[in-house]
């Protein structure tokens, strides 16, 4: 599937506060060009979040309806969830700490300190924690915000640049020498993660994209001599 950058930028441009946050992010984030945890990854998450927001507003089979304020919290959380990511140099606990510090600095820079901003920071920080890996929050314990952020963090694997962006991006960040092992572990992670998806959007997207994804994944393995992984 293709990443619709226009949809993402349209929502950011139309909201002055999100626009300020995005400008802060691009000016202060030192991980924009990491092999995997980069700007493209973050924009890919935001696209899925926007789609979930739009679907929740127009479909009757959704158990929730997101308001514009919910969307802003989710976009802000996605924007900063990998802020100043270490790219494999440190644990994800450190990465999440960096993300929260970046978010706090952004909010204080734009708004100053107030009870309202402290509350916004608290909500976004808790949401961001859902992406710390290995996961520190069980799937069954996720709040709606946390579930949306975690599932969108995983759904980026369905973009057409998956092989070059995620497989080789992660390999470079992790300094991985055993591509066969990474190939197998990545498959196991994705299949397990997709089975745990609970959002209607995530389930439908996986159903529509899984055949293409798995076919490409197995062809990639065959080309490199890894063999086929069972579906």
Model regions and ranges:
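Acidic/His-rich, divalent-metal-binding segments that scaffold phosphate/diphosphate chemistry
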Residues: 1-90
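Short alpha-helical scaffolding segments that buttress acidic/His motifs in well-ordered protein cores
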Residues: 21-26, 74-80, 124-132, 148-152
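Short capping loops/turns at secondary-structure boundaries
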Residues: 69, 76, 92-96, 117, ...
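Divalent metal-dependent phosphate-bond-processing catalytic cores, especially two-metal-ion Mg2+/Mn2+ enzymes
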Residues: 1-8, 36-37, 50-68, 80, ...
């Amino acid at each position: 599937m293709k990443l619709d950058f226009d949809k993402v930028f349209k929502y950011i441009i139309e909201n002055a506060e999100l626009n300020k946050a995005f400008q802060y992010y691009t000016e202060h984030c030192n991980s924009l060009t990491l092999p995997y945890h980069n700007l493209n990854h973050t924009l890919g998450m935001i696209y899925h979040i926007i789609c979930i927001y739009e679907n929740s507003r127009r479909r009757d089979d959704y158990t929730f309806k997101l308001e514009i304020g919910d969307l802003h919290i989710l976009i802000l959380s996605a924007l900063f969830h990998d802020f100043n990511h270490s790219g494999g140099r440190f644990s994800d606990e450190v990465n999440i700490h960096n993300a929260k510090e970046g978010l706090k600095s952004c909010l204080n820079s734009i708004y100053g300190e107030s009870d309202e901003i402290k509350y916004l920071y608290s909500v976004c920080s808790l949401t961001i924690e859902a992406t710390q890996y290995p996961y520190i929050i069980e799937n069954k314990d996720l709040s709606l915000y946390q579930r949306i952020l975690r599932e969108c963090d995983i759904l980026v694997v369905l973009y057409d640049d998956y092989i070059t962006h995620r497989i080789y991006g992660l390999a470079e960040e992790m300094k991985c020498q055993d591509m066969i092992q990474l190939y197998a572990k990545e498959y196991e992670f994705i299949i397990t993660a997709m089975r745990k998806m609970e959002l209607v959007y995530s389930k439908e997207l996986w159903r529509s994209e899984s055949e293409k994804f798995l076919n490409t994944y197995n062809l990639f393995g065959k080309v490199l001599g890894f063999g086929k992984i069972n579906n």
